[in-house]
Amino acid sequence: MSYDGYVDGITARLSLALDAELAEATALRHELHAHPELSGGEQLTRRMVLDRLPGTEVAEVADTGALVRIGGPGPAIAVRAELDALPIKEATGAPWAASNGAMHACGHDVHLAAVAALARCVHRAGGPMPLLVVLQPREETYPSGAKDVTSSGVLPRHGVRAMIGAHVQPVLQDGLVACDGGVVNAAADEFVVTMRGRGGHAAYPHLTADPVLALAQFAVSAQQIVSRTANPIVPTVVTIGSLRAGDAANATPDIATARGTLRTMSQTQRPMLQARLAEIATGVAMTHGCTAEVTVLAGEPPLRNDARLAEVTSRHLGGLGLGVGGPLHSCGADDFAYFTEVLPALMLFVGVGDGISMRLHDHEFLPPDHTVRSTARALLAGYLAAAEIFGERGLTAECGDLACR
């Protein structure tokens, strides 16, 4: 048997086994979507997924997360799926829509169902390497669940050689998968800037030190970080999402607060941008007779896909009937980035629309059910590629014919 023939054979076998799991996976997706749980409270979600997974080796991780090993001892390939939902009131009108004020508006229900389908497929049909399923909590908030998983040491203890993840992406055409090497998502830090002034009657501004005016100038001046501090060829974003000050129209408050996000695709540029943000806040505050307090909450690093893993996965995607789209790089962030810091890893972006009719984190976000199939196939492509690269004898581990190589 030739090497290519063997690869085609195992791909066909696993593809058929995967398709056999899709009805069960779709039912799981509906159940998960109807019962979303917020970050840190994903116990029911974890139980619903674990009840559908094979494997006898189950361990808790990161408080409400879990690890499930499929296959025997030895080096393994890991796949990640996120457990948490968002505090959004759903308005999709689906028969299985959530009604508890939370919502799977970022596709985590699809990711979980796809990972469950892959795990059952590998268990039933056999795979080239053991599979470690990582059910990760707290992707949408801090502290990061992925960071807790990596710092716990469980991945090296399970002999994990590579990590695969997938995320639905409405800006990418349905049926396409973006599979790029290098940095594909930005580092993301949150910041809080508090301007402290001297309040008083709005009719006597000369007797006050106005923190609202100081905060407004800061909000405008902070945009100069992008145009005058950041390297112009490195994608950088400063967005202020919250401004809060006072309660009365005729009174100047003592305090005004801004909250926002600072994002860059350069890890080395990150400390410089944080420092410049603080300098601008302090300088603007002094100009207005106020003081500034700046707190930066460091988030995930840039997400850097392994180039070799991306290259080989692209080939397997074609063999599984998926098109390769992209490149797709954005200043979005995902704590999957922590996995890319400690081992070869790949995040795949699975197209679910036309970029117009659906948006992530929107109360009407609802990818079609067939997205479970395309996401599961994308994960299968990554799993096969990782086994080919990092397996002790590549995909020929089952071949039995050294001429395959």
Mark where each language-model region is:
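N-terminal hydrophobic/helix-forming segments and targeting peptides
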Residues: M1-H30, A34-P36, T371-R405
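Acidic/His- and Gly-rich active-site-bordering loop/insert found
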Residues: G5-A105, D109-M129
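Divalent metal-coordination and catalytic microenvironments
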Residues: L32, V79, H108, V133, ...
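Metal-dependent amide/peptide-bond hydrolase catalytic core
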Residues: A216-R405
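Histidine/acidic-residue-rich, glycine-tolerant segments that coordinate divalent metal ions
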Residues: G65-A66, L86-K89, G93-M103, D109-V110, ...
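Non-cysteine beta-strand/loop elements that form the S-adenosyl-L-methionine
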Residues: A78-R80, F191, M347-V352
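Electropositive phosphate-/nucleotide-binding environments in soluble metabolic enzymes
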Residues: D8, S15, D19-L22, T26, ...
